Amino acid sequence: MTTEIALKDQSCETIEKGSKAMIIPRIESYLSQMPGWDVPLDYQTLTKTFSFKNYHQTVAFVNAITWVAHKEDHHPEICFGYNECKVILTTHSIKGISQNDFIMAAKIDALLD
């Protein structure tokens, strides 16, 4: 019997420059399990916009993301305003999406569980 570890329970790994980005069918397979996350047509980033009641909740969420990013050494682009936060994930060393991006997405989603 094979037991698969949930993405949120995995850790990001170092991805060497020159490694290949994740292939589109695999991206789409992961994406189907990640409600609210989106991949633009160029398949280079993974994005999601989160909404909150106020600025305090938004900033608290951003701060929580930065802690996870620090622990995982995988840092998203974060854009936020009064009650909204957009998270953009990509693996810079390969100029595309890797499993690390989906691990971070799952960990970010888990912050709101």
From Swiss-Prot:
GO BP terms: tetrahydrobiopterin biosynthetic process
EC number(s) given by UniProt: 4.2.1.96
Catalytic activity: (4aS,6R)-4a-hydroxy-L-erythro-5,6,7,8-tetrahydrobiopterin = (6R)-L-erythro-6,7-dihydrobiopterin + H2O
Cross-referenced SUPFAM superfamilies: PCD-like
Keyword Hydrolase part of the UniProt annotation: no
EC class of the enzyme, as a word: lyase
One MF annotation (Gene Ontology) recorded for this entry: 4-alpha-hydroxytetrahydrobiopterin dehydratase activity
Keyword tags: Lyase
Pfam family, one: Pterin_4a
PANTHER family according to UniProt: PTERIN-4-ALPHA-CARBINOLAMINE DEHYDRATASE
Family, similarity comment: Belongs to the pterin-4-alpha-carbinolamine dehydratase family.
Descriptive protein name: Putative pterin-4-alpha-carbinolamine dehydratase
Organism: Hydrogenovibrio crunogenus (strain DSM 25203 / XCL-2) (Thiomicrospira crunogena)
